[in-house]
């Protein structure tokens, strides 16, 4: 049975010319020859650069980031290595009064103290932080000559004086 042909007037495109085995082999040899000569010459790394006069230029163009500037001892030494410490960013020193005011107005400290007064237990980190801040407040108050104990004693004395007046019937 014959296959039906397409439309009578339609022509097929001509087939592309297929290369013979010899032509393919010749092209492969040409590609290989070009590829073979595309690299650096043998021993180019050991021999250095091809231009002998360019060594002075190479030293000028050398990247300054490469290599260490500090000498490194290669043997075992008894002296410890002294490292240069980078200065930490200096915090502005506050006067004791300013630091005390800052600590007394600290919102986090106030919130944690309110939680303690309400009967809540703080975790270890929060408790440690609160203790450190309260200790610092005590130190600053001693430096400034202030103390809570004096205020409490004065209040107790005033209460006793008030009671004595009431008992004696005085105004």
Swiss-Prot record:
GO terms for molecular function: GTPase activator activity. A GTPase-activating protein (GAP) that modifies Der/EngA GTPase function. May play a role in ribosome biogenesis. The keyword Transmembrane does not apply. Pfam families: YihI. Residues 20-30 have a biased composition (Basic and acidic residues). Belongs to the YihI family. Residues 148-160 have a biased composition (Acidic residues). Keywords: GTPase activation, Ribosome biogenesis. This is Der GTPase-activating protein YihI. Residues 1-99, 145-171 are annotated as: Disordered. Residues 40-59 have a biased composition (Low complexity). GO terms for biological process: ribosome biogenesis. It comes from the Bacteria. InterPro entries: YihI. The gene is yihI.
């Amino acid at each position: 049975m014959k296959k039906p042909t397409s439309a009578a007037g339609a022509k097929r495109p001509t087939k592309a010319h297929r290369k013979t085995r010899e032509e393919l082999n010749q092209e492969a040899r040409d590609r290989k020859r070009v590829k073979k000569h595309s690299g650096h010459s043998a021993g180019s790394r050991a021999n250095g650069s091809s231009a002998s006069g360019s060594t002075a230029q190479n030293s000028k163009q050398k990247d300054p980031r490469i290599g260490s500037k500090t000498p490194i001892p290669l043997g075992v030494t008894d002296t410890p290595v002294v490292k240069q410490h980078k200065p930490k960013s200096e915090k502005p020193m506050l006067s004791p009064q300013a630091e005390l005011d800052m600590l007394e107005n600290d919102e986090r400290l106030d919130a944690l103290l309110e939680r303690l007064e309400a009967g809540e237990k703080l975790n270890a980190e929060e408790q440690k932080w609160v203790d450190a801040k309260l200790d610092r407040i005590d130190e600053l108050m001693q430096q400034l000559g202030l103390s809570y104990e004096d205020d409490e004693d004065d209040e107790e004395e005033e209460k006793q004086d008030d009671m004595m007046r009431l008992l004696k019937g005085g105004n």
